[in-house]
Amino acid sequence: MIRVCIAGNSGHAATVTRALPRLPQVEICGWCRAWPGEPMTEVLEDFAKLGLTPPEYPDYLTMIDALSPDVLVVDGLFCDHEEMTCQALARGIHVYCDKPLALTLTGLDRVREAAQSSTALLWAMQTARFDPWFYTAKQLIDAGEIGEIRLLTAQKSYRLGQRAP
């Protein structure tokens, strides 16, 4: 069994819970809010649909120290991703972290150094990476079908205001 802890739901943590039916070897062993009062609606609804009742912990450090999971899902405030990721990697815990990994280049260097000195793996939540439009573009680029790329700009559009759950 791959034991996974979820810390927060401020971005894409639900990509993990929604994949659980296809991942019988994965067990959610604990979860916590990444900041006081953080709504965990999507993740908790997914737990309920799947009949899961993993224990809640007061914070991610208490959780990972108590459970020693294989993987920590980092999905808190952007300003906390760097520290949460480095703490998990220092403990040999694999990290699946939402973007951004860090807010500064110095912070990103710290994350890189933590990953390089750890036995654990670091994976950023590039959730659209294998969507057909991105995957096709990557294949065309790799095959040299569109020539040398000199500039690339892209934007995923979001509606202004609050998004529906």
Segments from the language model and where they lie:
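Beta-loop-alpha module in the N-terminal Rossmann-like domain of NAD(P)-dependent dehydrogenases
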Residues: 52-114
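Short catalytic-loop micro-motif centered on adjacent basic/acidic residues
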Residues: 5-6, 73-74, 95-98, 122-126
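A short helix-to-beta-strand connector/capping loop
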Residues: 48-55, 117-121
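Predominantly a Rossmann-like dinucleotide-binding segment in NAD(P)-dependent oxidoreductases
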Residues: 128-165
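N-terminal Rossmann-like dinucleotide-binding module
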Residues: 1-50
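Short, Asp-centered acidic motifs that coordinate Mg2+ and/or phosphate
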Residues: 30, 70-71, 151
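Rossmann-fold dehydrogenase core element
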Residues: 110-128, 148-152
